[in-house]
Amino acid sequence: MEIEFSGEILHWHGPSPFHFIVVPAAECATLKEEWSFASYGWGMIPVTAHIGDTAYTTSLFPKDGGYRVPVKDVVRDAEELDDGDVVPVLLRLRLPK
């Protein structure tokens, strides 16, 4: 199962700062309808994310009725990405073993 979209890299400046991309509403509807069976604790959904030439494992986390894709520092460094960049994202569902 795959979902593709483009999104902006945002920087959250909280007590534990991190970068993420907001999943668009239409794709969130698909996630809720078709991928929720794979959810674990607090609605997290395990995925392999592809940004540019970099693939990494992470989990989508629910926020404000939608989902966020965490973007690891190693991914941002490898792809030379900055806050505000709009990038194509491919998500593949990771099924529990």
Region annotations inferred by a language model:
Residues 65-73:
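Short, structured beta-strand/loop micro-motifs enriched in basic residues and often containing a Trp
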Residues 1-64, 85-97:
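Long, compositionally biased stretches
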